[in-house]
């Protein structure tokens, strides 16, 4: 795992971070995307469905603004810049340090 210091870690400055692919842009995937991006990680949020990515982009922006309004976050634009939305799985998995699976549970 190749980790680099982004110097923009918004949670704990100076902590090394890396890049992560999150597979699944539903509620849980969006939550993980926010957690990783706020910690300074570069995030690739993947979903097979392009409309799910459109919803994710809007919902993440809304959630970041909500955190700011409650005094629980800052710099939502900077955090959004760390999240890239990807509909190609191979591209999402290229050059990442970690993969977080957040797909639907179909039993």
Give residue spans per PLM region.
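Rossmann-like NAD(P)-binding element
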Residues: 48-55, 66-107
